[in-house]
């Protein structure tokens, strides 16, 4: 898994000077350096910082992958372990995964996600559907949540359709054993999609949501936590406080504060009906204290929550950091995910 370095120096429109920041689309009004640039006329630029890869997987990886287009805006990448593909009678848990990127960047085809999910499908023995959802600011929230719910609905409809849909791979999925997962903003999406699904009860007879897996979930709030205030963490983390604030400005409905329930679920949905939840946190992540508080509040509402803090690593280390420390933590994460998906 390649190491990817991000420079998260945020620049707002009021601290730029000179003509270098002007463009045929007008001045830049929001920028997270190296990741996204938003112009006055609404034009958005996203530099190609991470390679986009096809679903091709080397045979030694012991899995297959392919893409399925659902609409003009949404598609999925499906990962199936060879162990399941080789046996017609084998069915595996289904894990629906949402990539991170502050709701504003990222892709299910990014090489770092492709590598991680290929490995996860094999080591956790599950079929993975990785969702490529609409991005902000062109599509502000709740667009990503809507896309997530629509993917779950599509899976259910394909499973029960007399036409079969994609039987060759759906026959490998056990819809009575489904998990929603994601990292960073993708973990936020997994959480909000789970809240919607559980509240609606729409799929109760066709889909059993067994658990939620939140890796470094991207939540926020107007009040700062201690880990958000400790700026030295920014040197070890892929997410800085200024970048976090910029992502929320671009993703939330216009005029909303960081106490909006989509950003700060403690304001509304911490008591929502949810299945067992596993939350991964990182020592040098600015989100650590907020995630710990989220676990505490969910437990106080009677939820079953397992929280894990990995030491010596920062935000999204599992896809961005190839150090020996990170590799050790990734191995631990994979083992815990396997045991969560396949409880003894």
From Swiss-Prot:
Keyword Hydrolase: yes
Matching Gene3D superfamilies: alpha/beta hydrolase (3.40.50.1820)
Record field: compositional bias (Polar residues): 1-10
SUPFAM superfamilies for the chain: alpha/beta-Hydrolases
InterPro entries noted in UniProt: AB_hydrolase_3 (IPR013094), AB_hydrolase_fold (IPR029058), Carboxylest/Gibb_receptor (IPR050466), Lipase_GDXG_put_SER_AS (IPR033140)
E.C. number: 3.1.1.1
Tissues showing expression: Expressed in leaves, stems and flowers.
Alphabetized GO MF terms: carboxylesterase activity
UniProt keyword terms in alphabetical order: Hydrolase, Serine esterase
Record field: catalytic activity: a carboxylic ester + H2O = an alcohol + a carboxylate + H(+)
Residues the record marks as active site: 184, 285, 315
Pfam families cross-referenced by the UniProt entry: Abhydrolase_3
Region (Disordered): 1-24
Motif (Involved in the stabilization of the negatively charged intermediate by the formation of the oxyanion hole): 99-101
Hydrolase found in the keyword field: yes
Top-level class of the enzyme under EC nomenclature: hydrolase
Family note: Belongs to the 'GDXG' lipolytic enzyme family.
Cited function: Carboxylesterase acting on esters with varying acyl chain length.
Name of the protein described by the UniProt record: Probable carboxylesterase 17
Source species taxonomy: Eukaryota, Viridiplantae, Streptophyta, Embryophyta, Tracheophyta
């Amino acid at each position: 898994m390649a190491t990817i370095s991000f420079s998260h120096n945020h620049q707002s429109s009021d601290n730029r000077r000179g003509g270098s920041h002007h463009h045929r689309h007008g001045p830049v009004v929001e920028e997270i350096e190296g990741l996204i640039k938003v112009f006055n006329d609404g034009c958005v630029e996203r530099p190609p910082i991470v390679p986009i890869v096809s679903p091709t997987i080397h045979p030694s990886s012991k899995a297959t992958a392919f893409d399925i287009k659902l609409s003009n805006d949404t598609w999925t990448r499906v990962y199936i372990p060879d162990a399941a593909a080789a046996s017609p009678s084998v069915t595996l848990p289904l894990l629906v995964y949402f990539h991170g990127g502050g709701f504003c960047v990222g892709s299910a085809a990014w090489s770092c996600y492709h590598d991680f999910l290929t490995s996860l499908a094999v080591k956790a023995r599950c079929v993975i559907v990785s969702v490529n959802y609409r991005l902000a600011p062109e599509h502000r929230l709740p667009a990503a949540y809507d896309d997530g719910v629509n993917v779950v609905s599509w899976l259910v409809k394909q499973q029960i359709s007399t036409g079969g849909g994609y039987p060759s791979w759906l026959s490998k999925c056990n819809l009575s054993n489904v998990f929603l997962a994601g990292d960073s903003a993708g973990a936020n999406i997994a959480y909000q999609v789970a809240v919607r699904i559980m509240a609606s009860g729409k799929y109760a007879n066709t889909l059993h949501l067994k658990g939620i897996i939140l890796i470094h979930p991207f939540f926020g709030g107007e009040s700062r936590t201690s880990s958000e205030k400790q700026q030295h963490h920014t040197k070890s983390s892929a997410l800085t406080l200024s970048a976090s604030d910029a992502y929320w400005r671009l993703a939330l409905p216009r005029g909303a504060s960081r106490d909006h329930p989509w950003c700060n679920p403690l304001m509304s949905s911490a008591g929502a009906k949810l299945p067992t939840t596993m939350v991964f946190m990182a020592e040098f992540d600015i989100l650590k204290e907020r995630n710990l508080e989220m676990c505490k509040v969910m437990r106080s509402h009677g939820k079953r929550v397992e929280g894990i803090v990995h030491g010596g690593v920062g935000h999204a280390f599992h896809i961005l950091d190839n150090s020996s420390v990170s590799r050790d933590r990734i191995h631990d994460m994979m083992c815990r995910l396997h045991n969560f998906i396949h409880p003894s």
